[in-house]
């Protein structure tokens, strides 16, 4: 049985179109909806987000991020023996986006590929799942991707949500290792909070029934998020006998700078040890954590041997944390 699972490569991709708060405010003003850069930044910390063009799907973004991660890992793509894609905006109802990614990457070894849906907690759930596959000894190189095109499900008549979300993808290659990698993970859910963050529309007979756009009770999400993120982060640290002062970097889900700062403060972690990309990426749901990870790896902040705490919270309500050593 394999002892550890370790990240050996990271990658990310953002659609070229960057939409600033000023540009978005001008677009919304044409619809009679008032907002401003100051209003958005003060409530979320977001200054810009990237949105995909109409012909771009989650798999398109995922493949770009995956190619970077595989190159960084220095392995042949045919050595990937499992693909897990975390997404809430799949290309189709079925087949899975993971299968589409497999084909687009030219991986012909018939490895299993499946999607995992836990909204903004998706990447944490997927990484923890991949870790279990590797530790069981059944797989050696798992491609884990978070990818979203949330711009497709935004209600542009609701200024409280349409200004928050962006599109993008992040990926890692998680491989069997004799060195410590994933140290611990913790995951939870509470279905009694389904209604506070959801897309209530349904697909039946090829038609959408109900509201096809994202709905969020921001205040309820904020209250729950800060509470559960602190608890699940401590749960993961305690499982690995790691204290907050031993954590080099915190990578929270990039949803809202106030939630992120509140969580870091409760954990006793200084702001300079938190990776924050929300100002430039917006909330990219399952893509936010791997996007932030790749940014910090490539700019040299996160280096081999660093201890990294990732935590996410999303619709469901779902939440989770992964503690790892790079």
Swiss-Prot record:
Sorted UniProt keywords: Acyltransferase, Cytoplasm, Fatty acid biosynthesis, Fatty acid metabolism, Lipid biosynthesis, Lipid metabolism, Multifunctional enzyme, Transferase
Q: Spell out the subcellular localization from the entry.
A: Cytoplasm
Coiled-coil zones: none
A GO cellular-component term linked to this record: cytoplasm
Q: Which CDD domains match?
A: KAS_III (cd00830)
Q: Which reaction does it catalyse?
A: malonyl-[ACP] + acetyl-CoA + H(+) = 3-oxobutanoyl-[ACP] + CO2 + CoA
Residues annotated as the enzyme's active site: 120, 253, 283
For the region ACP-binding, what residue ranges are annotated? 254-258
According to its UniProt entry, the protein's GO biological process terms are:
fatty acid biosynthetic process; secondary metabolite biosynthetic process
User: Which GO molecular function entries does the Swiss-Prot or TrEMBL record give?
Assistant: 3-oxoacyl-[acyl-carrier-protein] synthase activity; beta-ketoacyl-acyl-carrier-protein synthase III activity
* Domain of life, per lineage: Bacteria
Q: What is its EC number?
A: 2.3.1.180
Its chief place of residence is cytoplasm
Q: Which InterPro entries would you find in this protein's record?
A: ACP_syn_III_C, ACP_syn_III_N, FabH, Thiolase-like
> Quaternary structure per UniProt?
Homodimer.
Q: What does this protein do?
A: Catalyzes the condensation reaction of fatty acid synthesis by the addition to an acyl acceptor of two carbons from malonyl-ACP. Catalyzes the first condensation reaction which initiates fatty acid synthesis and may therefore play a role in governing the total rate of fatty acid production. Possesses both acetoacetyl-ACP synthase and acetyl transacylase activities. Its substrate specificity determines the biosynthesis of branched-chain and/or straight-chain of fatty acids.
Protein name per its UniProtKB record = Beta-ketoacyl-[acyl-carrier-protein] synthase III
Can you name the source organism? Cupriavidus taiwanensis (strain DSM 17343 / BCRC 17206 / CCUG 44338 / CIP 107171 / LMG 19424 / R1)
